[in-house]
Regions:
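Low-complexity, highly charged intrinsically disordered N-terminal segments
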Residues: 1-70
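C-terminal catalytic/acceptor-binding lobe
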Residues: 395-476
Length: 476
């Protein structure tokens, strides 16, 4: 059985059937009838484990396609200037590891060093650090934090992470247009963006962009999607179901997102994607969205937490490489970076699978008992989709693998939640993995420990020639 992606409801119904199928395969029909959530939670690593994980081989840096720093970028520049690249911004994340709310809206200019220490302490507590280690964090001086940030947080231009993300792309495209003797405003009007937000902030953020004249973009070229959240799944007397209402008929407070894989699949639902025209949402049918995708030479999917993006949103070498690989019939290009040696973090990692005789990107929750420090080549979460329609159509036909987890909801009870991942598209289509000659460590804002480097990245962004003036152009 496969996921049915025609609508929100068909996704829900087919996902229940697939989870049941997976549990019966693991436990057997008779044990499944008496199965409890506690038993599922106890075996969750084994349930999610990638098949043959024990035989997977580590991939060496030299075994990955190295991006040529001297690659001809003229086709890449032309594709951007003509509006033939779709810029996708995945900004629905709720920063659960940081515990600070929707990441898009975070404005670090409102922080101070006491707040940063608080973030570091909260993270240490969550990780179960010793009292001695926590006390060391409490004793970190403002002077040390300032050295790491290279400024006071209040010195930053007062912008949310999301606005910084959008503005950097506008800034870089304008610079590219000027270098090529093009009128920047006209080039910006040709650009197409797809912005994915969560239910709690979608209205606020989309209206903010509309109020700021879409940062110079044509409203017809800006698509939005509100990633849906889901009630928790309960197992009772051998039956799985989305547990939506209590005995008094009130909606349960147990909704969570189904990870970025569901976000990708939701694009294929009817009436899920919309434009804002004359202040109103105008929804697209699936066929309208597919038609919208037809002209693109590449879709680039950005993750809002990538910090290198804040001073260089356009990677011409990477785009040029993706376009070349697209001509070689690759439908997905994933960039690989090194692990953070100072604070190894979880994430998708590259391995060679001897069963299917190719490299695969495997998400961390499928890696069974591998530790973070065992993960060497990580997914940068910066993906290209040359031949964009091919990967989208394949996704509709097959759906993504369904991992799941048992988590506590806001109502204090535990439920099953699905956690499909975007990167698993690499199992559906011909995928190329690329990296740099000099393997750089992953550089993002996933954890509290990375907050000072995030302030620094924002400070570096503010120092770019003309960036402050661009923010003023839009009244920010």
């Amino acid at each position: 059985m496969k996921l049915d992606l025609k609508s929100f409801e068909t996704y829900k119904n087919s996902s229940i059937s697939l989870i049941k199928e997976k549990l019966i395969e693991f436990y057997g029909q008779e044990r499944f009838k008496k199965l409890t959530l506690a038993q599922i939670k106890e075996n969750i690593k084994a349930l999610n484990a990638y098949p043959g994980i024990e035989d997977m081989k580590e991939v060496e840096h030299n075994d990955v396609h190295i991006i040529d720093e001297n690659v001809n970028t003229s086709k890449a520049e032309e594709a951007i200037l003509n509006g033939n690249v779709l810029w996708e911004h995945a900004a629905a994340g709720e920063a659960t590891r940081l515990g600070l709310g929707t990441k898009y809206l975070l404005d670090l200019s409102k922080f101070n060093f006491s707040k940063i220490r608080e973030v570091l302490i909260n993270e240490a507590v969550k990780e179960g650090k010793s009292e001695e280690e926590i006390n060391k964090i409490k004793e970190i001086k403002d002077r040390q934090l300032k050295e790491e940030c290279e400024c006071e947080p209040s010195d930053l231009i007062p912008l949310s992470l999301g606005l910084r993300h959008m503005l950097q792309l506008i800034y870089d495209i304008r610079k590219l247009a000027e270098r090529n003797g093009k009128y920047a405003d006209k080039v910006i009007k040709k650009q197409k963006m797809f912005i994915i937000l969560n239910e709690s902030t979608c209205d606020e953020i989309s209206k903010e962009l509309a109020a700021n004249n879409f940062l110079g973009l044509n409203p017809e070229n800006v698509l939005f999607m509100e990633q849906k959240s889901f009630h928790g799944i309960t197992l009772r007397k051998g039956e799985l179901f989305y547990d939506e209402m209590d005995s008094d008929g009130n909606e349960k407070n147990n909704k969570r997102l189904h990870n970025h894989g569901q976000m990708v699949m939701q694009k294929l639902h009817n009436d899920s994607i919309f434009r804002i025209l004359d202040g109103e949402r105008k929804y697209l049918k699936r066929e309208e969205f597919l038609k919208f995708l037809e002209p693109f030479k590449d879709m680039i999917s950005y993750n809002i937490e990538d910090l290198s993006y804040l001073t260089s949103s356009i990677d011409l070498q990477s785009l040029a490489t993706a376009l070349e690989l697209g001509e070689e019939r690759y439908d997905m290009v994933m960039e690989v970076v090194g692990q953070n040696p100072k604070k190894p973090q979880k994430g998708a990692s590259l391995f060679f699978d001897p069963r299917i005789k190719k490299n695969v990107m495997v998400e961390s929750f499928r890696l069974f008992n591998l530790k973070n420090e065992d993960l060497k080549l990580m997914n940068k979460n910066f993906n290209h989709y040359p031949n964009t329609l091919n990967s989208i159509k394949k996704l509709f036909e097959e759906g993504l693998p369904l991992g799941f987890e048992v988590k506590e909801a806001a109502d204090g009870k535990e439920y099953i939640y699905l956690c499909p991942v975007q990167g698993d598209i690499n199992f559906l289509v011909n995928t190329a993995f690329v990296t740099r000659k000099e393997l750089k460590p992953i550089y993002n804002w996933k954890t509290g420990a990375q907050t000072t480097q995030t302030v620094k990245a924002m400070h570096d962004q503010d120092k770019q020639e003309g960036f402050k003036e661009l923010t003023k152009k839009f009244g920010l």
